[in-house]
Amino acid sequence: MDDLISISDALHIVTPTNFHHEIAIKCLQKNKDVFIEKPITSNTAQATEIIELAVSKECIVQVGHIERFNPTINRLKDIVSEPHYIEIERLAPFQARGTEVPVVLDLMVHDIDLIISMVDSNIVDIHASGAKMMSETVDLAHAHIKFENGVVANLKSSRIAQNYVRKIRTYQNNLYTITDLMIPQIEIYGLEKTSIFSDQCIEKAID
């Protein structure tokens, strides 16, 4: 691996999460930029060490939070400017891969990233619960997040569901949206009309 790092300009780390820290540190010590699949590491101490080393080495570290670049998500952010309440549901059938970390780091991490990008305020309170069902780590989890500006977010993630579900519901004054990332589609409900954005988020108005 050392030889591979030495001859590379940048590296993409796609190993199981418990190896991310060790490999990333080796790359950064040799002044290599890295792209790390989510989650960055299995704990905050290791993540902090990677970030601090990257800063000191002036290297780039990017984590694979791919939903940031989802065109449906970007369209939703254009529509929803001042959300008061957000619900996100991310469910998947069980797979042994990825169970070395809890479902919060395996799936919900995407939605935590989205919530932070949608709400321009600091988090003031978090309540969470979860359960181990089919692995040695938490397989399903709920999180209730409250922001300083009063926005509330409820997140639900499970990797023991029957089907894949990726849904976001937002509520703001006179506007309610349902976003299905599996289709993808955004339904918009307001006082005057209903609109649906689908097929790469092209608007279709319903009279």
Regions found by a protein language model. Give the residues of each.
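A contiguous active-site-proximal alpha/beta segment in oxidoreductase catalytic domains
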Residues: 41-98
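A short helix->loop->beta-strand "cap" motif at the edges of active sites that frequently abuts
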Residues: 30-32, 56-60, 151
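Hydrophobic residues in well-ordered beta-strands that form the structural core
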Residues: 36, 61-63, 179
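C-terminal glycine/acidic-rich active-site capping loop/insertion
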Residues: 66, 172-207
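Mid-domain beta-loop-alpha active-site segment that forms a flexible
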Residues: 64-71, 94-123, 138
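Contiguous beta-strand/loop segments that form the cofactor/metal-binding neighborhood of enzyme cores
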Residues: 112-185
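Beta-loop-alpha module in the N-terminal Rossmann-like domain of NAD(P)-dependent dehydrogenases
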Residues: 1-51
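Conserved SAM/SAH-binding loop
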Residues: 1-2, 90, 131
